[in-house]
Amino acid sequence: MNIQHKEDTLIVQTGGNYKYYSVPVCVDSIDLTTEIARSEEKLLTGPSKHVEDPSYIESLFKNLYLNAPEYLKCQERCFLILKRLLLGPTSVPCAVETWDKMDYMNENPITTQNGTLYVYKKCCKCPNNCLFNCTVLTNYGTSHVFRGLLSLKKWETDTEPMICFCNRAVPNSEYIAVIFPGEQKITLDMYPHLLNILTRYISICDIDTITNDLIIELGSSLTNRICIHYKFLFNYAYIAKDSFTFVPDMDKEVILLELNKLIMTVECCTNFFFEKIWKRLSGDYDKYVTLLTLDASACPIIQTGTMREIKHLAAMLNVGLSYGKQKILKCSLQFQKRFIGFSEDDVIWRNLFLIYFNVNYPHHEETSPVKVPVQSSVKYHILLQRLLKNKRADEHETIVDRFVCGGMLNKRSTESYGTWDRNVETSVPDEFNEVVTIRDDAFCVNAFNTNRVINVRSINKKHVTTAPSCLTFNFVTDKYIFKEPACTISTFGTSGNTLQSLNINMKGSYVEFIYMLNVYRLHTNTFKFLLPATVCNSNSSLDIHGLLNQEVMRSDRNAVFWTTNFPCMITNINKINMGWFKAATAIVPKVHGDELRTVIKKEINFLKTSPSVNFDPFLHNMFVELELRNRCQIPLMNKQLVLTLYICLCMSNKCEISGIQKYLMTLVSEGVFDYSKNMLAHTKVKHVCAIAGSRVCNNVPKILHNKKKVKLDSFGRNANLLTFFGHLNVNELTDRQLSTIVKILIFYVQNIKHRGGICLLKRIIRKFLNSRVNKKLNGYDCRNNSTNNEHCRYPT
């Protein structure tokens, strides 16, 4: 099954969906998990062959998510998964006959003295979906075990029990085991990988809060179990082995965990910073832990390093600093005669700066956090909340979007989440979508990105003096125009010329953007880019297809205004000025994603409610399909070819129009009318002209009209035949040309029933009725169409 990753741009193949069951862990006051635990330890703590398989981990997490109560929201389901992982893996022994064995039972023959479950096929008539009945046997050999995660009954309201206890056996504990099928096994070395998926949807602060709440709720009996699994989530066993010798000190363990969580929030290029932190902590832990847990009110002095190095680190770690000659913030440090201020949420970063620059701060034994006699649970809670304060995101990604896969989900997941409007075909961020499709009933509009403006910061490898020293950060220092990939990059540099802001104007996909950054780095002295980038402006263009009376988009509109330099009508929707050109072509500036969809949907609502709109569903669907096949707008000549071919087939063949339409749709789907996006007629974008050359970009098809060259797209690139006819000069046409045009108009008269289309035809035909060959053409066409006199007459 395909799982789509929106953030990691990764597509993997995973297994199917499995249904989980619940099994009690305590029956008739007998704890069934005690004796089997020792034989299961080797399996849980040993290396797993699936830990290096990301598809297996994704499949395991997906099934944990799907086997949660249906009424829970996305974030609440993640909280439930976290609670299951904190309670950890468990095993319930059972004895079963060969003919009753099923996939949820794993072989592990041992002898139990306290008790084991003897399981057999359900023979009672209880109205439930249980598969087995059971009885408790003591001093009996166990043949199999149920493996899964420990949980609580109140959490697993929708998890079906596997065993019916209508006989004397009575489960008497609030704890149950959520058991997995034999194909799925969970081991402790999978915990960091599961945490990696969890942190996509919930923050580290949420994880700490849930952990502390769970310790308080379940009491001291399970505190040790929860803390152990909490450490495995953050791969504590590996960190302790490689960084420090293990010391059973609660403070030290928590500090190590918090620092490793902090590393997850920054980029891998900052390894040199944290390597020095680890080295100094491992060398003299007591000295540097005092700096690490220093209060925000203290103001230590840095005596090594340079101001440039401090700014460089702050930029790489994305830490905001303020500078002044007086102490203005509570959390600050002093360098020479200047004070450097941090926000109170960044106190841990200030303390890490102190360790990095090896600050000598007075060490008081009585105030050392290691020496303060505080209870472990309180100390644990305080340090967790103090060392790291992550900002919660306002929105979380919905996990269900990652499991969309064209009807391959089982019935339960489909009923739980409903149906989706579209399949996820790409894993590109919404800001970098090259085409956005908006569907509303019979209308479908494809909005194509014409260009986007992206802001990103960069750091230079070395100091290069390319600008005057008085230059401030808001002036352009350099401007680059690349042919491949096509982009224009403006550089805004600081006076030190180490940290720069890049303003990128480009058209293309997310992959082309990453490619462009690497090309830029090859031609400049850029050391690294401080991602993520910000798309601050995105412009899109769209065509309304199948609209016969195209002028309706620029007529009978309220609250619009016209530009003076070129004929463009502006509509204002949600404070966005949407420009309508000739022939139902529009541009939408500044917005992308959901904002773009909202603007276009309101324009579609105008089309649906306007009484003068005449809409051809076949032409609409055919051109929309052609756009989606080629992923770019249809050039002028390609559209005219398809339109004239359709009209000629309808006029020259006596077969039904539906057959012609079906034939044309088949040709479109087979790629007969495909085109290249490099066939665009002209452009004003400088970097696109740099690729093809200005001569090619200005090479627009022209015709000789009234001894002048006229561009064919002067009526609009999306113009249909009726729009062309409305601008023709009848006196300059030959008799044969007029005859052909009148035949086409008669065809439209016979097939257009809407008032808007009839009004348009009236205006066009009146022009032709005043021509010098009017009587001849009128009599010729009426004789050829005498079967239907009502439609042969021109409307007046």
UniProtKB/Swiss-Prot annotation:
Organism: Elephantid herpesvirus 1 (isolate Asian elephant/Berlin/Kiba/1998) (EIHV-1)
Entry's family note: Belongs to the herpesviridae UL87 family.
Highest taxon above the source species: Viruses
Residues spanning the signal sequence: none
This protein's name: Protein U58
A Pfam family matched in the record: DUF587
